[in-house]
Amino acid sequence: MDSHPSLMGRSITNSNRSSLDLGRPSSSSSSSPSPLTKSISDASSQSLSSILNNPHGGKSGVYGSDASWVGWWSSSTFVAPAEFAPVASTKLPGSELTRSDFHGYVSSISESHGRFEDIRKHTREESCGFDQESHVSGLAACLREVPSLYFKEDFALEDGATFRSACPFSSLNENLALQEKLSQYLDVVELHLVKEISVRSDSFFEAQGQLQDLNVKIVEGCSRIRELKETIRLLDRNLVDSARQIQELSSTRINMLELQRKLRLILYVNQALSALKLLVASADCAGALDITDDLQNLLAGDELTGLYCFRHLRDHVTSSIDSINSILTSEFMRISIHDTGEIDVLILSAANIRGSISSNGNTGEEVKLEEEDTSTLCDRLLPLVIGLLRTAKFPSILRMYRDTLTSEMKNAIKKAVADLLPILVARSLESDFSHGERSVDDGGGLSLASKLRTLSSEAFVNLLTAIFKIVQAHLVRASEVKKAIEWILCNIDGHYAADSVAAAIAVGAVAAETAQEIGFQGGSLVSSPLGKATSKAPPLQGKSSDASSLMNMSRNFRADVLRENTEAVFAACEVTHGRWAKLLGVRALLHPKLKLQEFMSIYDLTQEFITSTEKIGGRLGSSIRGTLQSQAKAFVDSQHESRMTKLKAVLDQETWDEIDVPEEFQSIISSLFASQRLISGKVDDADLNSYHSNRLPLNGSLTSGSGDQNSELRNEKSESSEGSVVSDAQVKPTVSPESLERSKAGVSSATNNQSNQKAHGKSNLFYQGVGYHMVNCGLILLKMLSEYIDMNNSLPALSSEIVLRVVEVLRFFNTRTCQLVLGAGAMQVSGLKSIKAKHLALASQVIDFTYTIIPETRRILFSKVPETRKPLLSVEIDKVAQDFRIHRDEIYTKLVQIMRERLLAHLHGLPKVVEGWNRPPDTNKQTKEFAWPLTREVGYLHRVLSETLHEADVQAIFRQVISIIHTQTSQTLTNLEISSTEAKKRLKLHVELILKCIRSLPSDNANQSDIPNWGQLDEFFAEHFREEEAGEAE
């Protein structure tokens, strides 16, 4: 109402003269603001050209040609606009435009123009509505004629700027005109005010009449209210007062009864507190818990609300429950743990008196409580468990019990070590002094670890045995406590207190759940007795649709207690495992150097300890098992290293001479391979293929014929192993290992072997019915294999490692033997002058024996090896066995090669011998030039091999030797040029002697009328000498 007149007034002031000149009525200028008027108020944001170029401009409105656009920029101060004549438009020639020129423009703005027309139509309809209301707002319309300056809120002529705007200093005539204009403004305002008042006078008087009618009605309503109040007062006095008095008396009676109940409750609580103190002082925990249940039930409700005298009741109950928990906890700890102290004293006393508990690692009878003691333990623990369950403190008490139990175990072990160690150290030193090993030292200045290291293995086993018994006593007690708690909680055998236990579990479950919900992290629990559990039942049922929620909480609470109960025993077992492992770790450097029996006594005792504790604890002890496994592996590695060193030294000192086999080693074969049928040293003569009747009286050795022969043999032995392989490849097709093995079955050694056995005792080592001649290193290897088998049986967990070590030992033995014998290394390390056929034969016997026992050794070792490791280990053992077989065949090939070289040496000198046969015959030297040395060496080789090798091996070797003699001799004799008869006779004698020697050699080759060892030399003899014999006979 205030803003419109100033705006309209400014508009009227600026366009007043133009409106009067154009003769427009004042009503048109007083109409409501049109969109054009709104655009005037925002003239600063409009384009001036768009206003002046409005196509709808005419002689009406502000867009008339005589209207100035200066009014659009008018301010509150009236400024007379300047009058400008319209610009005359001049048409230029050729600027005539037609409608068709605007078709493109019209088509482009047709859509926008349509929207514009719709908007203008809507605006026109709104303008018509404003015109209908214009006569109602006449005052606002007339005020437009007065400048807006006079309607400002801060209008004051005292203000210089306002005065200068309203009354500018000018001439006298202008001042008179200004006074006339101001009077005119005042008249206009007064006139329209009167009009407005007259227009609104009817409504004023109508409203005044309505107010008078309202006043009359209010007076009537007040009178009616006074009448109603009087009526109500009379009704109260006559009808309600007596009933109200009765109600007040009844209320007083109820209040008095409630007061009496409160007083009795106060009396009960006071007496309960007194009784609670007495029960706690007398350690009657069950009765005290009943009272705390009632008191906490009262505290959980609102009966004691507002009683200032019981403001500390909750604290009293809390302290009482703490006291009850302390009593129950101490009694539980005393029954569960401290009763084992007497057993420790008895065990230590017995150990001190006897000095050794059990030297073989046997801990004696298993510690076990009697049935009566177990029943008594359950009866003693039952009230304590029920009480701790009711207070919901049993899980935390069991955790405390676990910590206390582990601490007691540590202290018991520490005390046992402290008491027994000085005694055992002194006895160990005395024992060492009595054996002259070292001087006596009391060990007073040594540390505990040093004292443990000074103990002998037997003393250390005694110490471990004492600790085992003490630990077993504690763990058995803990196990019985665990079983008793399980018996109580799980209602085993339906014991008499099952209902009480179930109620206590329910109370404890609710208490634990409540404590968890309200955020208790420790301290006393004061909000969950049996009464409260009963009162809490409706909310619990509200949380779950049935009683399953309470059952689930009870089940979970019981599970928590049982878990903590199990964890306590397992933690005690873990502590004992750690202490035991620490004791073993102190002596970790000593145990690998022990003997097998000493180490196994510690190992077996530890295994028994682990088994016993794991049985009690119910879980595997990974830490102590790892410690024991690492020490066992270190023991195996140390034993293997020492045996490898010993085996290398034995091989380097080996002279490759045959030795008698002590009964100890035959017993090793009998005990290790008992499943095989062993034969004794007796040999049936009928089963032997003897050739002693045809043997020549040969003397000397194979390598003692001449210096050239010895040098040749040494050169052969000093060749590398590659030469052996080559020669083996050349001869191996004629010597089949399979045929050798088939020929060995059921065959014993030669007759000379039997005679040596009678003279010197048992000279052969028998296995599977076959006797083997042995040297020192072979027996040492057998002893080592038996020790590895013992380790394998004693340490089955390391069976795979032991098998690998056995493979390494066998491979080293085979390689080193090949270097010493075939490679002639023994001539440097052992001082041998030469490698004789006897050495080769004995080496082959040792290699053959080892190769023969490998399958049975593998079977025994693999009995402990896991199935997953067997394929890989089988491949390794098969490779080693193959190496042994190849080595044996190379030795046989070397023996054949030696005989071949000796034959070629004799044949090489035969032409010179033939040249001397033209001289007169000398009967004493007829055969000593060629045949006699050759047959002598062949006979020596036959004798040596027959005494050492098996008959099948001898036959296989001499089959090749005979073949070589036949081939080489016949070829050489064929190429000889013999011109005289005497030379032919001598040659015949030599050939007959060689054939006689060949006939006496063992061989499985028989041809042409069953003549033994028939060959090319026989054919040569028949071809050259049988015809002559036939001619002479004729």
Swiss-Prot record:
What's an example Gene Ontology biological process for this entry? retrograde transport, endosome to Golgi
Give the compositionally biased regions (Polar residues).
700-710, 746-758
Give a Gene Ontology cellular component term annotated to this protein.
Answer: Golgi membrane
Keywords for this protein? Chloroplast, Coiled coil, Golgi apparatus, Membrane, Plastid, Protein transport, Transit peptide, Transport
Main subcellular location: Golgi
Membrane topology classification: Peripheral membrane protein
**Localization:** Golgi apparatus membrane; Golgi apparatus, trans-Golgi network membrane; Plastid, Chloroplast
Extract the InterPro entries matched here. Vps54, Vps54_C
Kindly state the tissue distribution recorded for this protein.
Present in pollen. Mostly expressed in roots and flower buds, and, at lower levels, in vegetative tissues and mature flowers.
**Feature: compositional bias, Low complexity:** 18-42
Q: Where is the composition biased (Basic and acidic residues)?
A: 711-720
Phenotype reported upon loss of the gene: Lethal when homozygous. In hemizygous plants, male-specific transmission defect.
- Write out the ranges of the annotated region (Disordered): 1-42, 529-548, 694-758
Entries under Pfam families matching the protein: Vps54 (PF07928)
Q: Which residues form a coiled coil?
A: 224-264
Extent of the transit peptide: 1-87
What's the family? Answer: Belongs to the VPS54 family.
Quaternary structure note: Component of the Golgi-associated retrograde protein (GARP) complex, composed by VPS52, VPS53 and VPS54. Interacts directly with VPS53.
Role played: Acts as a component of the GARP complex that is involved in retrograde transport from early and late endosomes to the trans-Golgi network (TGN). The GARP complex facilitates tethering as well as SNARE complex assembly at the Golgi. Probably involved in pollen tube elongation and other polar growth.
Q: What is this protein called?
A: Vacuolar protein sorting-associated protein 54, chloroplastic
Species for this entry: Arabidopsis thaliana
